[in-house]
From Swiss-Prot:
Source taxonomy: Bacteria, Bacillati, Bacillota, Bacilli, Bacillales
Gene this chain is encoded by: rsgA
Molecular function terms, GO-annotated: GTP binding; GTPase activity; metal ion binding; rRNA binding
GO biological process, one term: ribosomal small subunit biogenesis
Main location: cytoplasm
Name this protein carries in UniProt: Small ribosomal subunit biogenesis GTPase RsgA
One Pfam family named in its UniProt record: RsgA_GTPase
Subunit-structure text: Monomer. Associates with 30S ribosomal subunit, binds 16S rRNA.
Length: 293
């Protein structure tokens, strides 16, 4: 039986890419019975009479799975945040990073619209960028008006499945249009009333760019820490994870425990204050979450 990867799911059809091309398939009823929904990114077994009539027979085990957006087997996330319009938002970036780290997906931070910033804003954004690089993250500066700045992203996309995510209105679709001009993905200007863009992407689709596949997702419609527990959170902050091994108490939450290495690192300036503040904010949010039964 042939195998392939689902690159688009739309109106009950699954578009499976394989060695011979792309075949439009439906899911077998057994999937509904077993409460399995094939996802974009799934590696599958299928059978087909022709390119327009096929059936997905089996879904292979996933290495990870996102719910919103619904996509599986993601290698890395390109997190696009603008320097201005809307202004750079480290709190929202950290929220994305936690969600991505929790799913064992490699994050790459891409800061767009650097051509629009004044000098004070440039210095502030570059300072944040240096902080994130010290934490071990790749940080790229891009502008859709300077195509060569987008080109630096291409090597990161090779031989892997990437999701492009980030704040609405920061230029995700514009960036993909530069990488693949034939796409002509819809873009929206920023609403001056809201200071943010409207989502312009309506379904998840994997797009070929070089030897890689990139998902232009409809954005993360939920940024809540639904599945994350307090004890997971430390491991989603690389610099906290590094210091936490020196805490006196195993399972230290780095809030009120004595001889906490994380708090000591914050006081000594080895962990950025804003990162620790975001960590505390997220702990509070998780603790206030209504229990699920």
């Amino acid at each position: 039986m042939p195998e392939g990867k689902i690159i688009k799911a739309l109106s009950g059809f699954y578009y499976v890419q394989h060695e011979e091309g792309i075949t439009q398939c439906r899911g077998r009823g057994v999937f509904r019975k077993n409460k399995i929904t094939p996802l974009v990114g799934d590696q599958v077994v299928f059978q087909a009479e022709n390119q327009n009539e096929g059936y997905v027979l089996e879904v292979f085990e996933r290495k990870n799975e996102l719910v919103r957006p619904p996509i599986a087997n993601v290698d890395q996330a390109i997190l696009v945040f603008s320097a201005v319009e809307p202004d750079f938002n480290p709190g929202l970036l950290d929220r994305f990073l936690v969600l991505i780290e929790y799913h064992n997906i490699k994050p790459i931070i891409c800061i767009s619209k650097m051509d629009l910033v004044d000098e004070p804003m440039r210095k502030m954004v570059e300072s944040y960028a240096n902080d994130y690089r010290e934490m071990g993250y790749a940080v790229l500066f891009t502008s859709v008006h300077a195509a060569e700045s987008i080109e630096i992203l291409k090597p990161f996309l090779e031989e892997c499945v990437s999701v492009v995510a980030g704040q609405s209105g920061v230029g995700k679709s514009s960036m993909l249009n530069v990488l693949r001009p034939d796409l002509e993905l819809k873009t929206n200007d920023i609403s001056s009333h809201l200071g943010r863009g409207k989502h312009t992407t309506r379904h998840v689709e994997l797009i070929s760019i070089g030897s890689g596949l990139v998902a232009d997702t409809p954005g993360f419609s939920s940024l809540d820490f639904i599945d994350i527990e307090v004890e997971d959170l430390t491991f989603c902050f690389p610099e906290l994870k590094e210091e936490s091994q020196y805490c006196k108490f195993r399972g230290c939450t780095h809030l009120s425990e004595p001889k906490c290495a994380v708090k000591a690192a914050v006081e000594e300036g080895r962990i950025a204050d804003y990162r620790y503040e975001h960590y505390k904010q997220f702990v509070e949010e998780i603790r206030e979450r209504k229990p699920r039964y």
